[in-house]
């Protein structure tokens, strides 16, 4: 739909009747004459539909109705004046004269007077660009009941724009179902009318969301088929099983603050909480016996010895010493290892790869531990000191001694049961 240029941008909508005219037609203006000279006439718009204007905001144009006594008031240039806002006049908007011989006004005189009488137009069309606006000139008896001197619009209750062709390219507000032809006007409408611009609304509770993802996540709370997992020891409810399992660990751990009865997954988190939230009752002395020398809690203990670990994976790797399990095997020589790091370092003996280089000389090494030993031995005067406490070192030595004794007992037991295998 083509845009109409106006003097006042506030008048956004004009109603038109689209008339298809071919170039070979003899006349593009439909004129009918009547001999009803003295009856006042008015204007009425027929077959209206919405017209899109440059700024895209739709408003109804108010048109001034006038009472004209005769058709002498119709000039060749001035046709209709619209409430002082703009006028259809001049060469931009003018009546197209009829050039057809069949449509020329008759020059014969009135039988009663013998002279040619001025006749009011019964219908005329105004062409704007390639569009034709058609107006109907009616008599006072055919005019609406409203007084002609009022400033009301001629068009009462115009039909809304609902055709897909008319709605193409418009911006639709999801809150109030209003259409806009300009993006800036649409965004300003969202901010001024609907507040914080949350177009997505939950049909269950009325909550609004800024994006569809948030609304979809919210709709899960209304689902009747949503699984619920409740804790067996407290009234808390969880929507996921893993959340419930993680919560259960807090009931079985000893990491509980006795001041506020809060649960913590680790002993370190509990001590940090006590030092910050309850500094008056916090004991900053040596850690209890169930803590490792590095300050971490000893949550896992070996099934074969009394050695304790903070992480479960460290305990599993340690137990391979007792079981003799070596799950990692080399693809070159089929040699097996208990740890993946040992296998990686062994494979480099086959590939001759030396990824770790010394920054002070040109020597390179297979792993980082060899590089560290080289730096301490060749480039520093300090002796190699292992970062481990004396008490922890003695504990490890005792555990290794017990492991050797247990292994010797197992070998003797096997020898007694199978004496011929030795």
From Swiss-Prot:
Location(s) in or outside the cell = Nucleus
Q: What is this protein called?
A: Zinc finger protein zfp-2
In which tissues has expression of this protein been reported?
Expressed in vulval cells and all somatic gonad structures such as spermatheca, sheath cells, uterine cells and distal tip cells.
Keyword terms, alphabetized = DNA-binding, Metal-binding, Nucleus, Repeat, Transcription, Transcription regulation, Zinc, Zinc-finger
Q: Which GO terms describe its cellular component?
A: nucleus
Identify the SMART domains for this entry.
Answer: ZnF_C2H2
Give the organism, scientific name.
Answer: Caenorhabditis elegans
Region of interest (Disordered), residue spans: 95-119
Q: What happens when the gene is disrupted?
A: No visible phenotype. Double knockout with lin-35 results in sterility, defects in gonad migration and vulval morphology.
Specify the domain of life of the species encoding this protein.
Eukaryota
Q: InterPro entries from the entry?
A: Znf_C2H2_sf, Znf_C2H2_type
C2H2-type Zn finger ranges: 171-194, 200-222, 229-251, 255-278, 300-322, 328-350, 356-379
Residue ranges with Low complexity bias: 99-113
According to the UniProt entry, its GO molecular function terms are: DNA-binding transcription activator activity, RNA polymerase II-specific; RNA polymerase II cis-regulatory region sequence-specific DNA binding; zinc ion binding
Report the function annotation for this chain: Probable zinc finger transcription factor that acts as a transcriptional repressor. Acts redundantly with the transcriptional repressor lin-35 to control the development of somatic gonad lineages. May, in addition, suppress sensitivity to RNAi.
Which cysteines in this chain are paired by disulphide bridges?
none
GO aspect biological process, one term: regulation of transcription by RNA polymerase II
Query: Which Gene3D superfamilies did the record assign?
Result: Classic Zinc Finger
């Amino acid at each position: 739909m083509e845009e109409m240029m106006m003097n006042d941008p506030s008048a956004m909508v004009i109603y038109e009747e689209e008339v298809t005219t071919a170039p070979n037609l003899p006349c593009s203006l439909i004129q009918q004459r009547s001999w009803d000279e003295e009856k006042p006439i008015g204007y009425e718009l027929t077959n209206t539909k919405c017209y899109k204007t440059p700024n895209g905001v739709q408003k109804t144009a108010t048109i001034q109705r006038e009472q004209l006594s005769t058709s002498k008031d119709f000039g060749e240039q001035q046709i209709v004046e619209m409430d002082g806002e703009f006028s259809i006049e001049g060469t931009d908007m003018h009546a197209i004269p009829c050039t057809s011989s069949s449509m020329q006004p008759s020059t014969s005189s009135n039988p009663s007077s013998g002279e040619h009488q001025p006749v009011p137009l019964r219908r005329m069309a105004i062409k704007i660009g390639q569009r034709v606006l058609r107006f109907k000139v009616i008599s006072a008896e055919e005019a609406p009941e409203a007084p002609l001197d009022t400033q009301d619009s001629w068009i009462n209750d115009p039909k809304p724009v609902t055709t897909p062709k008319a709605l193409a390219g418009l911006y639709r507000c999801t809150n109030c179902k209003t259409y806009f032809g300009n993006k800036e006007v649409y965004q300003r409408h969202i901010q001024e009318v609907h507040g914080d611009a949350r177009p997505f609304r939950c049909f269950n509770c009325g909550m609004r969301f800024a994006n569809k993802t948030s609304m979809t996540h919210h709709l899960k709370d209304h689902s009747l088929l949503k699984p619920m997992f409740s804790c067996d020891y407290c009234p808390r409810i969880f929507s996921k099983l893993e959340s419930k399992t993680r919560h259960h660990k807090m009931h079985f751990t000893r990491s509980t603050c006795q001041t506020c009865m809060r649960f913590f997954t680790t002993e370190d988190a509990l001590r940090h909480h006590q030092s910050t939230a309850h500094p008056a009752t916090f004991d900053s002395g040596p850690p209890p016996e169930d803590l490792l020398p590095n300050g971490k809690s000893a949550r896992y203990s070996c099934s074969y010895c009394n050695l304790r670990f903070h992480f479960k994976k460290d305990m599993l790797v340690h137990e391979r010493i007792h079981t003799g399990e070596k799950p990692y095997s080399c693809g070159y020589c089929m040699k097996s290892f208990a740890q993946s790091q040992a296998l990686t370092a062994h494979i480099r003996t086959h590939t001759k790869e030396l990824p770790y280089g010394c920054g002070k000389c040109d020597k390179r090494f297979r792993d980082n531990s060899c590089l560290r030993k080289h730096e301490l031995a060749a480039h520093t005067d300090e002796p190699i000191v292992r970062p481990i406490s004396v008490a922890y070192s003695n504990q490890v030595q005792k555990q290794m001694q017990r492991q050797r004794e247990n292994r010797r007992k197992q070998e003797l037991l096997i020898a007694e049961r199978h004496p011929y295998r030795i």
